[in-house]
Amino acid sequence: MRHFFKLGLVSAAVLGSQMTLANDFWSQDRQWLLGDWGGERQQLEKQGYKFTASIMSQAATNLDGGYNDSNTLENAGQLTLGANFDLSKIAGWEDTTAAIMITKRDGNSLTLERIKDPRSTTLGNTQEIYGRGKIWRLTQAWVKKGFNDNTVQFKIGRMGMSDDFNSSQCEFQNLLLCGGQLGKSIGSIWYNWPVGLWGTNVKYQFAPEWTLGLGVYEVNPDNVKTQSNSDGFNLDMNNVKGATIPVELAWKPKLAMFNGLPGEYKVGALYSTADANDVGTVSKVHDSKHSFWINTQQQLTQHNDNAKRGLFVSFNGVVNDKATTMVESTQQLALWYKGPFDSRPNDSIGFGLANYVVNKRVRDRQIATNESRGYYEYDDLASNYVPIQHDELNVELNYTYQWSPAVMLRPNIQYIHQPAGVKEVDDAWVAGLSMRLNF
């Protein structure tokens, strides 16, 4: 709660100060709450320097159900500070860009506090912005160079893996409905935002609609430590356990069956050389693990002559290595309509469903562990009872109120079936509110 009120006070102070500084503060065309710095900001962008600063807040309250139905409100937040550099303008390096991004997360998760059995391994989360510690992190520090009219692009530095592979839209507050799926099921080797890690990748656009990507990223547990802020700026590779190698094929057609509207279809696979524990057999270790994925997004309709308005759909799926991964697969289906009203062309309405499928080998091991301790049915009180995990379904309905490019509000209703995959935990209803402020 205190983080929620802190964010509210800061936001109110900023908003109030801007009302006195700019007559056009309430304009729906306003790009940044701190304004254009008297024209300097756009001038810097023309020279190759683009600066970003934003606050994202995600509040959630339990309406009914869950492991603990005592009502509470939890808020998670993130501060992002970044800069992008067009080095062709700054230094004359043709087709070269660079970026640096620092993030700070804070707050608490309603899922951990109320929704799931605290003895069970977490699957989903009602606030996608929560996780990876309440510390400062160097999230990005990379350089990208284009060759052959940018049909070949080479990138190296510190980055998140889903920046370039298994990426997807994020029109929702629920974790599994936001962005790529791999980090939600194999987080021990696939590090998503806000974690940065050493890596490199190359993308080759071998035809106008087709691109092939290949990457190599370190598997380093030090990158996900959360004890202190220094953990978020760890740059050494002393504890590297191996490498994760993703490959992805992307197709961006404008199909006649969708009236020539744009779509994107991606298939990918990864191979990790790091040792991985077997999920069903104690002390058994594998020398690798693998996963496969599909990402699809398609615009289905267009509103009159405005290409940005209309109905969009996405489907994302992941299949993981059964020998080494607790979550066998995930599926996500989402629909959103941009510009539902002529008076609100930048708003959207979204509805999505996402599912975790827990590996049967994990479930068998949980059952065997409980039976060895004398438990043959769910025990709500025993601290050494291991909840048996099945599937978890997440559903969200939301409305995105885009007042301006600088201010976004997203009220939402979420439904969680079998929180953390535990059948004995009541299905939960949650009300949420996301807010983003761009400064």
From Swiss-Prot:
Transmembrane is among the record's keywords: yes
Keyword entries, A-Z: Cell outer membrane, Ion transport, Membrane, Porin, Signal, Transmembrane, Transmembrane beta strand, Transport
Keyword field contains rRNA-binding: no
GO CC entries: cell outer membrane; pore complex
Membrane topology: Multi-pass membrane protein
UniProt-annotated location(s): Cell outer membrane
InterPro entries from the UniProt entry: Carb-sel_porin_OprB, OprB_Porin, OprB_sf
Signal peptide (residue range): 1-22
GO-annotated molecular function: porin activity
One Pfam family this sequence matches: OprB
Gene Ontology biological-process annotations: carbohydrate transport; monoatomic ion transport
Function: Could be involved in the transport of quinate or shikimate.
Sequence similarity: Belongs to the OprB family.
PANTHER family: PORIN B (PTHR37944:SF1)
Record-given protein name: Putative porin QuiX
Lineage, opening ranks: Bacteria, Pseudomonadati, Pseudomonadota, Gammaproteobacteria, Moraxellales
UniProt gene name: quiX
